[in-house]
């Protein structure tokens, strides 16, 4: 399946909540879900009671859309989480949070995960001083993530830093926007997930 390239605001309306896929627009009164909170389409205003399977599927789709991941890779992360010690659902969320594009977003080096993915792909991001252009790269404790010197002076990055100047990163990350860099000070835990998610539904979906 190809990556979704349509209007991302439709995805938020489909899930019935903000997924913060549009960056700065999501924080303004132009946000589509604030104006039309029902799903898109001819029958969008109808609200049928979902089945158990439907609830599991919706939760899976929601988290996939938040992180911008396709099914094959999403399932691979789940398989990794199952093999790790501890609670599968919590392991799964921790893996998703450790993706480089997500970390760039969490640090405030981008205004959305999609923008962070583009920054990584175009070689603007360094990990421990070396360019990493793989959005799915999983960071480890102690890693330093920074914006390349030649890139941080660009108009777009200056706009990003200004927009995120008051941002407080999750406790597993530290950031210095003046230096355009941050550090992974710990591994993310369930407490660090700041969006509503019932990960047990995803576990149940893949355990059917």
UniProtKB/Swiss-Prot annotation:
SUPFAM superfamilies in the cross-refs: Alpha-L RNA-binding motif (SSF55174)
Entry coiled-coil feature ranges: none
CDD domains (UniProt xref): S4
Residue span, S4 RNA-binding domain: 98-161
InterPro entries assigned to the protein according to its UniProt record, in alphabetical order: Ribosomal_uS4 (IPR022801), Ribosomal_uS4_bac-type (IPR005709), Ribosomal_uS4_CS (IPR018079), Ribosomal_uS4_N (IPR001912), S4_RNA-bd (IPR002942), S4_RNA-bd_sf (IPR036986)
Entry GO terms, CC: small ribosomal subunit
Any one biological process term the GO annotation gives: ribosomal small subunit biogenesis
The keyword Disulfide bond is annotated on this UniProt entry: no
Function: One of the primary rRNA binding proteins, it binds directly to 16S rRNA where it nucleates assembly of the body of the 30S subunit.
Assembly description: Part of the 30S ribosomal subunit. Contacts protein S5. The interaction surface between S4 and S5 is involved in control of translational fidelity.
Protein family: Belongs to the universal ribosomal protein uS4 family.
UniProt-recorded name of the protein: Small ribosomal subunit protein uS4
Gene (UniProt): rpsD
């Amino acid at each position: 399946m190809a990556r979704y390239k349509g209007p991302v605001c439709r995805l938020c309306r489909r899930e019935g909540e903000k997924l913060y896929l549009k960056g700065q627009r999501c924080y303004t009164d132009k946000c589509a879900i604030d104006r039309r909170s029902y799903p898109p389409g001819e029958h969008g205003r109808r609200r049928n009671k979902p089945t158990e399977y439907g609830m599991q599927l919706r939760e899976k789709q929601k988290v996939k859309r938040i992180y911008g991941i396709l099914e094959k890779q999403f399932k691979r992360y789940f398989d990794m989480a199952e093999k790790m010690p501890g609670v599968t659902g919590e392991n799964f969320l921790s893996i998703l949070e450790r993706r480089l594009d997500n970390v760039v977003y969490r640090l405030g080096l981008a205004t959305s995960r999609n923008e962070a993915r583009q920054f990584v792909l175009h070689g603007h991001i360094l990990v421990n001083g070396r360019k990493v252009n793989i959005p799915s790269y999983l960071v480890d404790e102690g890693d330093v993530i920074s914006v390349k010197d030649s890139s941080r002076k660009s108009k777009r990055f200056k706009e990003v830093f200004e927009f995120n100047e008051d941002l407080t990163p999750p406790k597993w990350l530290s950031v210095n926007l003046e230096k355009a860099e941050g550090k992974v000070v710990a591994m993310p835990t369930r407490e660090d997930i700041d969006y509503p998610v019932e990960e047990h539904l995803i576990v149940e979906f893949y355990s059917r």
